[in-house]
Amino acid sequence: MPRKFYADCVACLMQSSLNKANAITDEALRYEYVRGICRIIQEMDPETEAAPIADSRIVHLRRELLGLEDDYTEIKHLYNGLILQLYPQLQAKVRAAADPLRAAIQLAAAGNYIDFGVLSDVNPERLMELMDEVAEKPVSESEYAQLRAELAEARTLAYLHDNCGEVALDKLLIETLRSLYPRLQVLSVVRERPILNDATMEDAEEVGLNEVAEVIRNGIPDLPGTQLSSLSESVRARLENADLLIAKGQGNFECLAGCGLNV
């Protein structure tokens, strides 16, 4: 099995954590926070633990040392509302496309930009630009052909969601999938509770995800990913029994890399 934690993961975690540390005015506290992050990274098992595990531990450190809880409620409403406002227009664009599935995939991929855990400067203007540019973004033809072949045979799809806003674009993709593959049953999996700006049940309800899929929580608190070993027996069984999994976002993919499922 390939390793799950790389040197690039260390650099990314340190940069995002230092960006948050800049808001700490007490230098002694800031030092303890950064030292705690270094300790978390040092204690990671690169063979079995992916970067979202470190993220989870850093969230606990911030809570215990600084008494801080990340609150992205307003940001979530902003981006969910933005995509919902555009939804009829995007829906029409996908339906009119020469290849509706490809168009829906490209839009859903553009939504992955809305990641406040990785980027320090996420803004609606850049998101709009990305959605306008998606038709020019190439899709791997071999992977796309494989996906279509597997969808033609699949009866069940587990869709692991990532961020707010993006989840509304995921809804459009699922809607497109179900129109093209009417027998496909879709299970949407969201975070157990708020962490960073990841999609939760509240976000799913806000964008009407339940209109196109069965929506469940993953049951894992404070983890920006989907770690099979941390899932409840019932949720894990549903993922293992799905014919196909779509894992949106880096955190979900990192946790599931090499897991043996059809991701």
Where on the chain are the PLM-derived regions?
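Redox- and metal-dependent alpha/beta enzyme cores, enriched for Fe-S-associated oxidoreductases
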Residues: 169-227
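Electropositive, gly/pro-rich neighborhoods at or near active sites that engage anionic ligands
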Residues: 2-154
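Internal active-site segments that recognize and position negatively charged phosphoryl groups
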Residues: 146-179
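An acidic, phosphate/nucleotide-engaging active-site surface
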Residues: 209-258
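Gly/Ser/Thr-rich loops at beta-strand to alpha-helix junctions
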Residues: 162-171, 193-195, 250-254
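A general structural motif
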Residues: 154-156, 183, 242
